[in-house]
């Protein structure tokens, strides 16, 4: 199995630290609003990665955090005249509601930043003791100049970053030894939530939160760290700098970053105002359709959010569901063909989780099933791929029996040339969203 490592900019053989086990951390949402489709892309992309690793036999410890203390949360809470805790808890609940509908497997743990404040203070103190950090008027900053290979992850160099920051005159920059230094701790402002630290009251910076939560729960070195491409710099870059400064160990072995969701050629984001929340979209779009749309493009490629793309996803799901509903798990099939499908699917997915190539194989498999191939092993592979994709088809046996009875009655009407009765039954089924398809092997049905 190979993974494209953002740090090295190349495909690398995947070798977990502990054979058979994967320690995986994915940056979660800042909980001040509903997640939008771009946020959901990251959630679904790494859910698919996790599920495929489990399909391949790995035991995955999957951690994804909630940032529940942040400038945006404070601002939103003030505007509603509620506490930051009340606001963040509301949107954590909404996150679970949305992602459950998208059939995202719950993380092994979802730590909240506010649960690790004491550990963050200890982490910062170690950086101060090692002279990687300094205090400036109650704030604590990281000395970027002491970090080896700083910004290699983002393919940048420190000289360029310093040149780009040289014209800044904001208040925070004046507190720093260097414009590139970043905040580990922010001193308390009036009426803000804060915690007491040896250097004064305040709250942690954004970057320190993920370093502390990930290393506290997974250890000093992690197998896989994921997130959106926009997190390469500065967030993940700063995570590397501060984590490796503290531990002296490599922080992450494989960095993975998903591409953006674009709207009219621009990244979907709250700052641009071109976003659609998952909460509002799922009022009008079936969760399976959104899940399929997000899951079936290779995670590193950009994804264009359009009505046509959602319609295509819906049509593809219908084709897959139709094959699944009519798969006879008692039938006999050429198992060598099944082995070829399985091997080809694994070969595609083993190449950096290339679901696009995997879907090409899967669509060929679906066509093969539609030709009458079936059996228990065929159904088992079908179920495995659906699990990786995060798609579930509810087979309602009582309703299916009723439909089959109506189809049988229609067939009897056709045999006695009672076409009026036949058409009446067809129309009744269509009114229930059931479409009949006459084939040489008999009548099939599927949902509209």
From Swiss-Prot:
The record's GO CC annotations read: cytosol
Q: Can you tell me which residues bind Zn(2+)?
A: 27, 210, 235, 239
Which catalytic reaction applies to this protein? tRNA(Cys) + L-cysteine + ATP = L-cysteinyl-tRNA(Cys) + AMP + diphosphate
Q: Where is this motif: 'KMSKS' region?
A: 267-271
- Cofactor(s) of this protein: Zn(2+)
Example of a GO MF term? zinc ion binding
Q: Which NCBIfam families match?
A: cysS
Protein name, per record: Cysteine--tRNA ligase
**Lineage of source species:** Bacteria, Bacillati, Bacillota, Bacilli, Lactobacillales
**Gene that specifies this protein:** cysS
């Amino acid at each position: 199995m190979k993974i494209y490592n953002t740090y090295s900019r190349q495909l690398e053989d995947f070798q977990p630290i502990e054979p058979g086990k994967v320690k995986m951390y994915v940056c979660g949402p800042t909980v001040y609003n509903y997640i939008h489709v771009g946020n959901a892309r990251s959630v679904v992309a790494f859910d698919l990665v996790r599920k495929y690793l489990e399909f391949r036999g790995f035991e995955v410890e999957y951690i994804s955090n909630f940032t529940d203390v942040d400038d945006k949360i404070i601002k939103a809470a003030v505007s509603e005249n509620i506490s930051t805790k009340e606001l963040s808890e509301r949107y954590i609940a909404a996150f679970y509601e949305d992602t459950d509908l998208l059939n995202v497997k719950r993380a092994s743990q979802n730590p909240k930043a506010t649960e690790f404040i004491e550990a963050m203070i200890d982490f910062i103190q170690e950086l101060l003791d090692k002279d990687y950090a300094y205090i400036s008027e109650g704030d604590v900053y990281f000395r970027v100049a002491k970090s080896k290979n700083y910004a290699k992850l983002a393919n940048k160099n420190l000289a360029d970053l310093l040149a780009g920051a040289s014209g800044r005159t904001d208040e925070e920059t004046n507190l720093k030894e260097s414009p590139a230094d970043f905040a580990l701790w922010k001193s308390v402002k009036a009426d803000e939530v804060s915690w007491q630290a040896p250097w004064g009251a305040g709250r942690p910076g954004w970057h320190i939160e993920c370093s502390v939560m990930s290393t506290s729960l997974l250890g000093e070195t992690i197998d896989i760290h994921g997130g959106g491409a926009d997190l390469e710099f500065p967030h993940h870059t700063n995570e590397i700098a501060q984590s490796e400064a503290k531990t002296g160990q490599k922080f992450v072995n494989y960095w993975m970053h998903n591409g953006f969701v674009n709207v009219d050629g621009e990244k979907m984001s709250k700052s641009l105002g071109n976003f659609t929340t998952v909460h509002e979209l799922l009022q009008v779009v079936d969760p399976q359709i959104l899940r399929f749309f997000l899951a079936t493009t290779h995670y590193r490629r950009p994804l264009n959010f359009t009505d046509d793309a959602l319609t295509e996803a819906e049509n593809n799901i219908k084709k897959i569901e139709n094959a699944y509903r009519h798969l006879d798990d008692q039938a006999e099939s050429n198992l060598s063909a099944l082995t070829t499908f399985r091997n080809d699917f694994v070969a595609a997915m083993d190449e950096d989780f290339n679901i696009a190539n995997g879907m090409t194989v899967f669509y060929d498999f679906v066509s093969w099933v539609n030709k009458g191939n079936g059996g228990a092993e065929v159904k088992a592979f079908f179920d495995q791929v659906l699990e990786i994709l995060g798609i579930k088809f509810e087979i309602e046996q009582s309703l299916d029996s009723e439909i089959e009875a109506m189809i049988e009655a229609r067939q009897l009407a056709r045999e006695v040339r009672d076409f009026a009765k036949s058409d009446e039954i067809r129309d009744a089924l269509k009114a229930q969203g059931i479409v009949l398809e006459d084939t040489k092997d008999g009548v099939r049905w599927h949902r509209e």
